[in-house]
A protein has these predicted regions:
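C-terminal "cap" of GNAT-fold acetyltransferases
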Residues: 145-181, 318-342
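A conserved beta-turn-beta hairpin within the catalytic core of GNAT-like acetyltransferases
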Residues: 63, 71-83, 90, 247-248, ...
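C-terminal structured domain segments
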Residues: 268-326
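Conserved acetyl-CoA-binding loop-helix of GNAT-fold acetyltransferases
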Residues: 85, 91-107, 132, 283-302
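Conserved active-site alpha-helix within GNAT-family acetyltransferase domains
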Residues: 96, 104, 108-114, 118-141, ...
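Short amphipathic alpha-helix that is part of the acyltransferase structural core
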Residues: 1-39, 54, 155-206
């Protein structure tokens, strides 16, 4: 076979889709969209270099593989990279050549960043390729569905209702609250939490606008938030209602219903799970953070299943969810995702 390499051209995506067929992994589904015309990064679009490999037959080049490397404003310390080669052209050095060319292009990135990262699924050709070329895992991520009633509901203290006898009617009403996704208080804790769990790949300094756009804007599908607060106190004793709300201990942002895996057994999937992003105030100690997340998760999954992303860096969420996975009260949806890097 005679392989030639060139810049990505408009229309290559349609040709390659015919050659590649459907995506083999969720990572392929996600990153195929990053294959696009190269950009110098000067017109408001990220810097990008995209290269196509053609199999030349009788003087006609047929695209069979492509690779891309590009900058991102979020997590700017590494460049994202993606390579895909047609099944019948693998193990012929095409992927290795594309990676070498992309590394050379990365040296010209305006940011000066040259480290690469990619997402792979363990046990796949992509994971084996990454390992062979020195890209090692720096994070593991799983999608987990927590079944209804998996966690015991928290018990909140009875409340003094307007100076009358304590009763259970409003127990927890000053601790568990709905919050608008546009809330500045919510935006602040979400941004700081996201930064705290990404010490392995810093997101950089996140502005209020960036946090809103990433997690809380209507375009993300966010349609509600629930927070668990610190029990408020009153300077005038228990008989007087406190004038200020307690600070946020944990939060959950809910999104549009997650799509079910078409390859999974319908009876096993059951009711549709609500997609949620669960986190906590980063300043909490590990035990308090785990307790806060566990209590909030028990409320979220009281009657309906919820789906959440569980990264290995999310210590408090792991403390709540991993025992549920072991006991069968939660299940993993799909395969692990590994972020690999130089």
């Amino acid at each position: 076979m005679a392989i030639e390499y060139r810049e990505w051209l408009e229309g290559d995506d349609l040709t390659l889709l015919e050659v590649w067929g459907g995506p083999e992994t969720e990572q392929a589904r996600q990153f195929r969209g990053a294959l696009a015309v190269s950009s110098a990064g000067t017109d408001g679009t990220p810097w990008r270099r995209c290269i196509v490999a053609e199999d030349v037959i009788d003087g006609v080049g047929i695209p069979v593989a492509a690779g891309v490397v590009y900058e991102a404003s979020l997590h700017p310390e590494r460049l994202w990279s993606y390579i895909e080669v047609a099944r019948d052209h693998r193990r012929a050095g095409i992927g290795a050549t594309l990676l070498t060319m992309l590394r050379r292009e990365a040296e010209q990135a305006p940011s000066g960043v040259t480290k690469l990262r990619a997402k792979v699924q363990p046990g796949t050709a992509g994971a084996a390729f990454a390992e062979a070329f020195g890209l090692a895992p720096i994070q593991r991520s799983r999608l987990v569905v927590v079944e209804p009633g998996a966690l015991k509901l928290p018990v909140f203290p009875a409340k003094n209702d307007g100076g009358g006898p304590a009763n259970d009617e409003n127990a927890g009403s000053d601790v568990v609250m709905d919050l608008a996704t546009g809330s500045v208080e919510l935006t602040d804790v979400v941004g700081r939490y996201y930064t705290s769990i990404h010490g392995w790949d810093s997101p950089g300094v996140l502005s209020v606008g960036q946090v809103q756009k990433l997690f809380l804007d209507d375009l993300t599908g966010a349609h509600g938030a629930l927070v668990l607060r610190v029990e408020p106190g009153s300077a005038f004793g228990a008989a007087v209602s406190p004038s200020k709300k307690g600070r946020i201990r944990a939060f959950a942002v809910s999104y549009a219903e997650a799509a079910l895996d078409p390859a999974a057994d319908a009876s096993a999937q059951g009711a549709k799970a609500t997609d949620v992003f669960v986190g906590h105030e980063p300043a909490l100690d590990s035990d308090d953070a785990a307790a806060a997340v566990r209590d909030l998760l028990s409320l979220l999954a009281y009657q309906h299943p919820v789906m959440l992303e569980l990264d290995d860096s999310m210590a408090a969420l792991r403390a709540a969810v991993e025992p549920l996975l072991e006991s069968g009260k939660a299940r993993q949806a799909g395969a692990d995702t590994l972020v690999v890097s130089d």
